[in-house]
Every structure is written in C-alpha cells, then in structure tokens.
Amino acid sequence: MAIQRYMKNVRPDAPWCPDNIEFIRRINGLDSVEDVKQIVLDASYFVFGLGDVYLGAPLATPLDPTHRLVTTKYNPARTWTAEGSVGIGGSYMCIYGMEGPGGYQFVGRTIPVWRNKGFAHLGDEPWLLRNYDQIRYVEVDAQELLLLREACSNGEYFPQVESVELD
C-alpha cells in the first residue's frame, strides 16, 4: 500500500516503483528477485544501533559481506510506511517501529519491534532488539504473519532468542 500511495501522490516514475525488490535486484546485478529474497533470508543481520527511524527501530547490516545488498533510499521519502516494514537503505537494514514516513526499499514485513507494554521475556523494555543482537528472518505467508503480529502485540508470542558468540 505504501508504494501505491507513493506512486499516486509523490513520484509515479521513480525507478524503484512499483517493485522495490525488483529494483534491488537490478542495482545489485542479481539474476532474479528470488536471489534477493534468498540473500535476505540467509543473512544474519548485526544490530549496531537502535532508534534510527523511530521507536526501537534497529539499524543493522549483514555480518557476512556477501549478504550485503546496497540500494538507494526513496527520494523524496515516502509520506507513509507501515509499522513492522523491513527495508534496506544504503547497505543497512531497518525495521520500522511505528507508522510514519520513510525511505528504505521494502524487502518484507515482520513482527512489532516496539510494544508499549514491554516484552516480558526481555525485562519489560518496550523495544524488542538491543545493540549487538543478530536478526535472522524466516519466510511466512501473509496469514501466518498476521497471526504472529497479533500474538506478539498481545504478549502471546516471543521470537526465538539464543546466545551466540561472534567469531
């Protein structure tokens, strides 16, 4: 919906419209959009900052340089981005912690990273992620994502968290 709004109200001829993943594929010289998807799913993203976009939004980059996708940001920025959107801008990945403007190229959507009631399994902080965390994505269909997002918002779902050492 954000891309359609952007095309209607801001810049209908932008090179990343109507498909951000196709745009990422082209500027990274990949053979298919499946290649983009596989790189995102195979990557382990290292969180080195929070709040880049709003409310606990992680700023992260893949640990393995072969998983780094590089892309431009929207110019001008979108006036609306859905909460939980996952995007890449430059070589960084971000998850939008709230609805608002934005410019990262969309690669997906995930569970909320900000919860006013806190995440009980993480010490009741309102943000899901911390500096030095690693993020791995798992592909789910739209219906499963809706159920996971609702369960997470209600405090009934907790993402898998494990301790690992960086080498």
Task: Give the residues covered by each predicted segment.
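Conserved "landmark" site that anchors the functional core of diverse proteins
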Residues: 1-167
